[in-house]
């Protein structure tokens, strides 16, 4: 089936067709870098990194741009508070942002432009808008005149006439209409400033993205993404000024991800088919913003609030378990549920290693869908039922991703694929007598390669899971204690003191530690 995407602009799913066949241009609004990145800053990049992965897997050549806003009122205020320069603060916070993206496996960004590097391009657009009558200078500032754009409000569904109802035609600051927004801001003493035809100043927020997207991706881009909270006014204003400048559609598809909100519980790894597809997108936006995770918890550095307690792999799995347009219930309880849910994936990887002697993480897998299709043509097999189940789960996963990048449903398919592989290992006794069964071994490798291929699309299972120690306990010390207990239990069993051995196992179980006896020895793991 063809890829279909839900565009906020049309409020419906559409067949994905790009401006240039075989190529995708994608722009995601990045952060204003005035403080350390929090978990909310990570949602969009992880989602759109996954979208790029799937589009590339589907055969597209994708160019993905994520901007950095390195000049803004917030940056100026924060730099003054800290007694540093805007440039130094922006550099430091940008590196923090990039470090967090790398930690989460977001490695597909092709261009990360800084707003201050595109001042000339911004001024060219502003001059063009003035010339066409869409903008006007005012006391060193330049404003976009919203009433001159007959389509203003089409993205958010807001009616400009209703927005202006009850307001005076001219506002006290001289703007023609209250809705008019700044394209250029005259500078104040001590603020960053660039020369312009309208006097020294700096760009408005919205013009930055229009200029960078146009310069790097062209007049019309395929996908414009961002959080639902950016739909209005930021994306609405981007669209208005860009289309007024070029006379062309700014973006073919507008994709908005849901916002983080305080955890309210729920199942991890389900379909999560309910998501933000309301015809009234502004109502959806306001509903999510009312529950948006903010304040001390939401704004806390992601390194402090999350990565000290949970492996980043868990965070990425967690975000994949929900459709990107859905609001995301976030909290330590949800991450703990995710950790517990995905533990089985890593146990499967361990079982695979014991059964085949192969390293899961170095398995070669197809990079594209067309390459993968070649290995899934119908063939006679001694394990026909198993092979058919693998093929069906592969189709289910890909159908989910074709349906507006539904990672929630795709993740559910991955869980079921894990069950199928575990059952095959058990039925064929591949960790025991069945190790000599070359046909079954090959079938398992084939299935696990599919498992890895699909996991790669989601950007998960990149490395072994790192368990975070509760209360900062020393992992090496804890492991040494566990090995001592395992040794004492083994001696008790050897001496036929089974009551003592069982007491050790039971006590550890109560502490949420599981012992697993294997031919090569006993291993332990801490349950989430």
Residue ranges: model-predicted function:
Residues 1-34, 49, 63, 99, ...:
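Alpha-helical recognition segments enriched in aromatics with Gly/Pro capping
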Residues 10-15, 19-107, 517, 521-524:
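N-terminal, positively charged nucleic-acid-binding surface of large information/translation enzymes
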Residues 68-72, 93-97, 107-122, 140-149:
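Short, glycine/charge-rich beta-strand/loop segments that flank catalytic centers
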Residues 79-86, 110-116, 199, 227-228:
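The substrate-binding groove and active-site-proximal loops of carbohydrate-active enzymes
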Residues 266-268, 275-285, 289-528:
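Structural preference for alpha-helix termini/caps and helix-kink/transition segments
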